[in-house]
Amino acid sequence: MISKPDKNKLRQKRHTRVRGKISGTSETPRLNVFRSNTNIYAQVIDDVTGTTLASASSLKLTGTKTEQAAEVGKLVAEAAKAKGVEEVVFDRGGYLYHGRVAALATAAREAGLKF
């Protein structure tokens, strides 16, 4: 019998492969995205020191999932700018740049983050 591939394991492999190529510094931290079935989370991470500079999630937001993702992008951009971060490296977390991930990225760009 043919077994279906585990989507999350494939995503984790993609994420690990990409993480070998990108890294956040104190000047340009990494904007990491995690997407669950119900919520979306975003963090601005300085990989040199291993600290999270800003974060936002859709845990308390309402609306459609795409609208929530756009709001999270706006919130994380505002939090990052409050910490003095203007430019980031976008880490899509192994997800396709489509739908909620793209909505978050677009909203973060519109809120003033450069990537």
UniProtKB/Swiss-Prot annotation:
Q: List the disulfide bonds.
A: none
Per UniProt, what is one GO molecular function of this protein? 5S rRNA binding
Q: Name one GO cellular component term.
A: cytosolic large ribosomal subunit
Q: Looking at the keywords, is Metal-binding present?
A: no
Disordered: where is this region? 1-29
Bias class Basic residues marks the residues at 10-20
One GO-annotated biological process of the protein:
translation
Q: What the protein does? A: This is one of the proteins that bind and probably mediate the attachment of the 5S RNA into the large ribosomal subunit, where it forms part of the central protuberance.
Among NCBIfam families, the record links this protein to: L18_bact
The entry's family comment says:
Belongs to the universal ribosomal protein uL18 family.
Protein name, UniProt field: Large ribosomal subunit protein uL18
Which organism does this record belong to?
A: Lactococcus lactis subsp. lactis (strain IL1403) (Streptococcus lactis)
Q: Which gene encodes it?
A: rplR
